[in-house]
């Protein structure tokens, strides 16, 4: 029985991983479609589309899926949905601020799913503007270290408009104004430095430190929100101390 139980558990875990992978692929494809619709279907002349395609490729999205999404967005093929971007605001456990970015073809469904995820996981919705002011839109580029030093990265991107380089342990995070994102990304490429992702993101201006129990609750809320097909990104101002992060990895 123990063998069967272990197999069943493994099968369940694989199903969960496959489901999450499928959701991630769908969200990356949606980004490509919207970027192509907004700025045209040529990645060379549409930096947002270029970055959306690069992110999808690095996440192993099949090239055929990427190309079909690009064509749907640009109008070369029929079948693209009327995607709308909506941002919802709220608070999670311990007063952690939460911004939820949705890309949906059904506003009512998106609002309902976000509200249910929030209320079932210790959060509550907030009025527009009551949370957003705690975040600033920034350009964010992440790259693996690969024997690079912080000085190497700074030297490559400082003149291109980078504001900060953060050491995340196994990787670096470069922060810039959204308008400088393409210039910073291009500077990395010119220096022969590969990067994982480049995108506009919300960065918190004030963070809320949490203990292990609160961190688990907030991450459970984030998981529930990200489980919605309409949710593209979830941003919080949670600050997880190193000892709490280490304990979370053991969960």
Curated annotation (Swiss-Prot):
Coiled coil: none annotated. Belongs to the TACO1 family. It comes from Mycolicibacterium vanbaalenii (strain DSM 7251 / JCM 13017 / BCRC 16820 / KCTC 9966 / NRRL B-24157 / PYR-1) (Mycobacterium vanbaalenii). One of its GO terms (biological process) is regulation of DNA-templated transcription. It comes from the Bacteria. InterPro entries: Integrase-like_N (IPR017856), TACO1_YebC-like_2nd/3rd_dom (IPR048300), TACO1_YebC_N (IPR049083), Transcrip_reg_TACO1-like (IPR002876), Transcrip_reg_TACO1-like_dom3 (IPR026564), YebC-like (IPR029072). This is Probable transcriptional regulatory protein Mvan_2570. One of its GO terms (molecular function) is DNA binding.
